[in-house]
């Protein structure tokens, strides 16, 4: 028997056999598997690290947001207390000096203090001194102030948001390409390549700085600058003055109606009837809509009807004053609520976005036009006999000044600050808290006794205001219409599946069941 022929170099050390290298190929495949396993473990570890870092950052940002929310709620509650105290102080002033027109004129004229911003605030002052910069000079001044402040990296980094770490996956790595299956191909040396980090850090620029950063990357043609400024820039001082001139009379009449109502009836009744301004706003916004949230729905209509029923119960409630004076005070309160609704709806149609209008400048011009244009009303009311002009004494004058500075100038600023810290919805809901606070104040200070009709009417007014605010927030939600549709569908479905008893003569089978059963048995 001839032994098998031995290949050359088969038993020598250091010499590879010419037979298929199964051992080398298995080692190569095991190395690839170990590399894939190592890459998978590294990716999983990076994902865990990313999750931990993002979790820590979200907790820090959430804590900051909770602090802002808590501060905003405290400020709004403080505003409610100021407004109730202002109403009580106004009622006290009217017992000594019953001049609603003088009180309204003095308080509204104190808005002119906001115009001191042209002396204190540099962008306002530059709108008047830099006429060559164009009608949007204030915007360029804000941009220059931003670029001057952001000259260091520390200032820029402090304005950025918290870092967010996101894993990066490179799809074009050579290791992810399929390996060659050719056995005879020699192993090629690895090429040197740049290795990037598998984690990407993301920071967001604040919205207040994003616009200036965009302008810095744009060219200088006037048309491009003008188009971007018309889109996102604030209104100029001239435009704000024109809007203030139009709304000066509406604002004054609304506040005059409120002061007249306070001179005729209790503070609680005035505040409850004045809270219906949100419902009048709903009706006017449906007629003159400014956005999709002004859509009229059946749920909002039922809330308005509920509020009207509460207003009727409030007017039927007895009080210490004569019924005629309470009726006049209720009419003044409703008139003030309607005028305030007209003011809100029209200013929303005039200004498409709230950030375009400088609120302190707006109120400052309202006070200025009120001071310059409405002073002839003293002569008109004096000679017609509606309100005799008489200068108040020192005590009453001091009360009017304090009430105007705190209850008008300061409270408006605090309310806007609270809305910025929380939201406009929470700020609107906070206005309704003046109703129970005013009731408690009337019971404690003036010893006013209200019947059960008053509380039975106050609850629907407060509840309907809350419902309308909630429905305006969810502008596409109409639960009443959805419920009616479901009930109608349920009733129609029950009628459709219900069968009427029939006689045996009226029923006829097209296929004989006996024949069908026989065919099934034969098969």
UniProtKB/Swiss-Prot annotation:
It comes from the Eukaryota. Keywords: Membrane, Phosphoprotein, Transmembrane, Transmembrane helix, Transport. It is found in: Membrane. It is a multi-pass membrane protein. The modification Phosphoserine is found at residue 207. Its main location: membrane. The keyword Phosphoprotein applies. The chain crosses the membrane at residues 69-89, 101-121, 243-263, 268-288, 296-316, 327-347, 361-381, 395-415, 420-440, 452-472. Residues 252-316 form the EamA domain. GO terms for cellular component: membrane. Expressed in colorectal cancer cells. Putative solute transporter. Belongs to the SLC35F solute transporter family. PANTHER family: SOLUTE CARRIER FAMILY 35 MEMBER F5, SOLUTE CARRIER FAMILY 35, MEMBER F5. This is Solute carrier family 35 member F5. It comes from Homo sapiens.
């Amino acid at each position: 028997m001839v032994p098998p022929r031995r290949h050359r170099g088969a038993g020598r050390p250091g010499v590879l056999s010419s037979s298929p290298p199964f051992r080398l190929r298995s080692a190569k495949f095991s190395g690839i598997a170990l590399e894939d396993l190592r890459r998978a473990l590294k990716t999983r570890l990076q994902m865990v690290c990313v999750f931990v870092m993002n979790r820590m950052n979200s907790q820090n940002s959430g804590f900051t947001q909770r602090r802002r929310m808590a501060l905003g709620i405290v400020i709004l509650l403080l505003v409610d207390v100021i407004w109730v105290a202002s109403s009580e102080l106004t009622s006290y002033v009217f017992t000594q000096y019953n001049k609603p027109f003088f009180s309204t004129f003095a308080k509204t004229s104190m808005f002119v203090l906001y115009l001191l911003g042209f002396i204190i605030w540099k962008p306002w002052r530059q709108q008047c001194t830099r006429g060559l910069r164009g009608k949007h000079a204030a915007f360029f001044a804000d941009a220059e102030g931003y670029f001057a402040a952001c000259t260091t990296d520390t200032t820029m980094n402090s304005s950025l948001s918290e870092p967010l770490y996101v894993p990066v996956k490179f799809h074009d790595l050579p290791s992810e390409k399929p390996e060659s299956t050719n056995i005879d191909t020699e192993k090629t040396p690895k090429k040197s390549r740049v290795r990037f980090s598998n984690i990407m850090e993301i920071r967001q620029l604040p919205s207040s700085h994003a616009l200036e950063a965009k302008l810095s990357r744009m060219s200088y043609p006037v048309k491009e600058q003008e188009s971007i400024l018309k889109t996102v820039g604030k209104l100029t001082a001239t435009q704000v003055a024109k809007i203030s001139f139009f709304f000066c009379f509406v604002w004054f009449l609304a506040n005059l109606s409120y002061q007249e109502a306070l001179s005729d009836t209790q503070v609680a009744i005035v505040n409850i009837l004045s809270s219906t301004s949100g419902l009048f706003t709903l009706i006017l916004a449906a007629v003159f809509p400014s956005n999709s949230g002004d859509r009229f729905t059946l749920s909002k209509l039922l809330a308005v009807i509920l509020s009207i029923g509460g207003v009727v119960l409030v007017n039927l409630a007895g009080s210490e004053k004569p019924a005629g004076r309470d009726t006049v005070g209720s009419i003044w309160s409703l008139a003030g609520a309607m005028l305030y609704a007209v003011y809100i709806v029209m200013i929303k149609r005039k200004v498409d976005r709230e950030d375009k209008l400088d609120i302190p400048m707006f109120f400052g011009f309202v006070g200025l036009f009120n001071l310059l244009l409405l002073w002839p009303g003293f002569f008109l009311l004096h000679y017609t006999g509606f309100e005799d002009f008489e200068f108040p004494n020192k005590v009453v004058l001091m009360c009017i000044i304090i009430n105007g500075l705190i209850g008008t100038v300061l409270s408006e600023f605090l309310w806007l600050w609270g809305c910025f810290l929380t939201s406009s919805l929470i700020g609107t809901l906070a206005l309704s808290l003046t109703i129970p606070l005013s009731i408690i104040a009337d019971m404690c200070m003036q010893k006013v006794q209200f019947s059960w009709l008053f509380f039975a009417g106050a609850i629907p007014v407060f509840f309907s205001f809350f419902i309308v605010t909630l429905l305006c927030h969810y502008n596409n939600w109409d639960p009443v219409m959805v419920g009616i549709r479901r009930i109608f569908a349920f009733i129609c479905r029950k009628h459709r599946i219900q069968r009427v008893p029939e006689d045996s003569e009226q029923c006829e089978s097209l296929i004989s069941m006996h024949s069908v059963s026989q065919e099934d048995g034969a098969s």
